[in-house]
Amino acid sequence: MPPRQLSQTTPSCAVVPRKRRLVAALIAVPGLMPALAHAQLVGEAAQPQPIDAPWGMQLAPQLEERPLQPGQKPATFVLGDTTSGTTDQDMAAKGSAEVRRNTVVIKADALHYDQDTDMADAYGSVHVVNNGNSFVGPEAHMRVDSSEGFMTAPKYHFNVTGGSGSAERVDLLDNERSVFTKGTYTACACADDPAWYIKGSEFDFDTGADEGVAHNGVLFFQGFPVFASPWLSFPLSGERRSGVLPPTFSLSSSNGFELSVPYYFNIAPNRDLTLTPRLISKRGVQLQSTFRYLSPTYSGSITGEFLPDDHLTKTNRYALYIQHNQNFGNGFGGYIYYNKVSDNTYPEDLSSSVNQFMNGTQLLYQQEAGLTYNNGPWSVLAREQHWQTLTPSVAPYGREPQLNVKYAKYNVGGFDYGAEADYSNFRITTADMTQGQRVMFNPYLSYSVVGPGYFVTPKVQWHFASYNLNHLSDADVAAGTPKNFTESIPTLTFDTGLVFDRSVRIFGQDYIQTLEPRLYYVYTPYRNQQSAPLFDTADSDFGLAEIFTPNTFVGNDRIADANRLTAALTTRFIDAATGDERARFVIAQQYYFQDQRVTLQSTQTSAQATHSDLIAGASLKLGAGFASETAFQYNADNNQLVKTSVGFGFSPATGKVINVAYRYTRANTTLDNTPINQVLISGQWPLAHRVYGVGRFNYDLGGHRIVDGLVGLQYDADCWTLGAGIQRYANGLNTSGQNQSSTRFLAQLTFKGLSSVDNGLMTAFRSSVAGYTPLPPPPPPESRFTNYE
């Protein structure tokens, strides 16, 4: 309503022209800014610092906000170039007019304030600041204390959350809630011409709950509508909120065009649910659902996927993934991992988008539940383990059930000792395979002598195993093998080394160079173990990590006989100023005093050699982000390079990385006579302003084919990002037994300030490129004191 005409008869209320004048403090001033601070300093930092002893003035370390005392009311201030009014009734101001109370500021060309109704009417270039939210328009009417009122044709900005927009009208319900009619919303900094915005018939905003709701909302990007919904909920900042997430698109040779539209339910701070309809042009509509939960004592997730009547296979297809971890307290815990798919080709055809760009196809699905106990030296595991195996993978043995107990004590008078006891009932889904029970007990005792520049560690351990087989297969055990038998095998190791160091200066830089010779001796007598099936045992790899272990097998069904000595020499170059290791060189070889007779299969011949292949490795870290790692295995008797890997990495700055690697393994029987001869190149590099390229290229030189390849682009704008990638990947074998490949495409558009969800593209970039740096997140929202008025 228009301002009331004020009487000019009272001298104290006469119109007095001036440039700026504080007219009245209508109510006593108990405190200026009550109860607003989100964070407070504590301790000595929060104490005022004296700066003027005679006057007792102090420098406050932060804004202090004093709550009102009981019975006190906040002060109201009216300012203007010219003012008129009646004390304790109303006041009118013109020219740079203002009304202030607590966190509410109303500015206008002219305004009228009625104390009885607490109503402020503002006209002309109105600017309302309410609890950090800013509204600009031609006219506003609101109750100052309750922050209730309306404004016509407003432009608004939420200072703390960063959102802004415009509308035909806004109704302010209080200092946090507001309703906009026929408005827009964006989180872009350039509100006049935003890259994306939501347009709706009505918006409900609650800055306290950090939530916005658009009715009949349409999402525009670069001026074009990309999504519409009769009800669209979204967060006003980076906090989680229920609502529709941005749709994702992909294209593959096996599925055609795909469109996924996730809907996110923020059930509670520690629980959420995501429902995702997934349209697959060649197969139909799949529904995906993921429920996550978290508490101080348990956490987990349940994911289900269902595709009714696949257009290509004419079957219903599904997948179920359950993961649960439980902490019962006092060292007790439990877990459940259950994963199942409907058919053998499900992971190839319908792998979820999050896993789409991961290399390879999952063929083993774990189904396991267990109880654990960990307390001091004790570690106990009781579990039931099963596997779903997809062709052409070979099924592993399950443990149905297993009880494993470990005990370990360290440095008890210089001694380390412990034991592992295990009972397992091994079962397998493959027909006509040996099954049965195994009881194992492995105690050990070692004593370490460590001094300046040397160490000596002798160790003795024993392997006891008892087998009770309930089914024998002619395919994996020799004829006449008993069903019940035991094994007892001792092992003695002796590990010793020296460490020398000296100061050196290389290219003007001071380093500490070390020289570290090491000897490792192993003795294990021969025991015939061909009666034992291979439940969990395979050949160990041969490298720098395995050369100092007593057994050449992994698992407990084979203990290799040994009488060998491993000799190694390591030298390091350490930056004398920082302690950073800049270079390392290692060379090692094993020397055999007798031939190893224990083999995995009875048909294999035992190794006959006086020494092993030579193993060497080197790692370098140079300036300007350059690093290199090299390792090779060389057979001096045959003058053959058995295995090598050479890798280089260059990362001069964030978002810039190039990796080059070469891998080679000579053909041998343990690798099914299949050599490895591959070149791997990957990297991330800025191509132009805000544009980054991401790529991975793995090429098989022997087979003249691409093992896997990925090419992607990322564009990082102020309030949106766009990523796209295309991948060529190995996808199993065809009916002729030859390798087959597939191609797929995935795009991801992210609106900063509206949503942040990865549909699998960022995961692919991160896993494909070592040293990959994600695009920077949007800047944090401004403080409510920014642009303070």
From Swiss-Prot:
Subcellular location, record wording: Cell outer membrane
Question: What's in the keyword line of the UniProt record?
Answer: Cell outer membrane, Membrane, Signal
Listed under GO cellular component are:
cell outer membrane; transporter complex
Question: What broad class describes the main subcellular location of this protein?
Answer: membrane
Its domain of life reads Bacteria
What is one process in the GO biological process aspect for this record?
Gram-negative-bacterium-type cell outer membrane assembly
**Which InterPro entries does this chain map to?**
LipoPS_assembly_LptD (IPR020889), LptD (IPR050218), LptD_C (IPR007543)
Signal peptide positions are 1-39
Show the Pfam families listed in the entry.
LptD
What task does this protein carry out? Together with LptE, is involved in the assembly of lipopolysaccharide (LPS) at the surface of the outer membrane.
Task: State the similarity comment.
Answer: Belongs to the LptD family.
Under the subunit heading, UniProt states: Component of the lipopolysaccharide transport and assembly complex. Interacts with LptE and LptA.
Protein name as catalogued: LPS-assembly protein LptD
The gene for this chain is: lptD
